[in-house]
């Protein structure tokens, strides 16, 4: 579940804190983010699902702090939300997004086609003007996804189409035995920054974001951290460079 409140609801915080959201049995709070009307929410799950919806259209402002909120994503059996991220909302038709992803992928690969472009959508093919391509390129964000087996990738946020909240979402990462079978992190990253990955064996590695491959949603990613068979990545966080 998700909910939105005014910051003023937390103006006077008592010494023992305030209730931010009512939780049902077995639930826990995943994250708290400040959002604006011109932004989107991205939820990702352990089983590799993701859903993106607009703050302005899908999240009303609650007047109190003690309700359970509204459904953000419908979880499958044994699944759970692992992250909440905030993305810039970009007005773009489905045909424009698909055309941009194909053109941007070909540009990165020196003319070779993009390996995966929003396979859940069937849209008419169009050609973007140079001006429109440049505008979308300037607005593009990338979402990092990392799995328990130390695999990861960057995916254009344009591959995460905006829908209504409460659905089952779309594939954010293809999970396999090879990549650990579970997603452990999913959030936006910027060029020039770095990542820290930590395992349950206490090992860490730092990786430049620029070195992480850009790939489609329905791919398993590539090796970021070579770990032992009984070892798992448990924590991933960005290191923002000045």
What are these regions (language model features)?
Residues 1-242:
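C-terminal interaction appendages of subunits in large macromolecular complexes
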């Amino acid at each position: 579940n998700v909910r939105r409140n005014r910051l003023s609801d937390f103006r006077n915080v008592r010494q023992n804190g305030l209730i931010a959201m009512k939780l049902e049995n077995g639930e826990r709070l995943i994250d708290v983010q400040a959002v604006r009307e011109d932004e989107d929410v991205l939820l990702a799950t352990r089983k590799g699902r993701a859903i993106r919806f607009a703050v302005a259209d899908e999240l009303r402002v609650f007047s109190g702090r003690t309700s359970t909120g509204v459904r953000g994503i419908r979880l499958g059996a044994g699944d759970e939300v692992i992250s909440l991220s905030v993305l810039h909302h970009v007005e773009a038709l489905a045909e424009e997004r698909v055309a941009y992803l194909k053109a941007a992928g070909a540009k990165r690969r020196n003319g070779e086609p993009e390996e995966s472009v929003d396979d859940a959508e069937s849209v008419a093919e169009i050609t973007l003007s140079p001006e429109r391509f440049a505008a979308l390129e300037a607005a593009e964000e990338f979402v990092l996804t990392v799995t328990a087996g130390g695999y990861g990738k960057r995916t254009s946020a344009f591959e995460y189409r905006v829908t209504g909240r409460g659905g089952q979402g779309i594939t954010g990462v293809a999970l396999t035995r090879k990549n650990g079978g579970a997603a452990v992190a999913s959030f936006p990253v910027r060029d020039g920054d770095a990542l820290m990955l930590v395992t349950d064996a206490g090992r860490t590695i730092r990786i430049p974001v620029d070195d992480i491959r850009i790939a489609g949603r329905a791919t398993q990613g590539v090796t970021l951290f070579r770990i032992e068979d009984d070892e798992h990545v448990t924590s991933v966080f960005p290191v923002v460079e000045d």
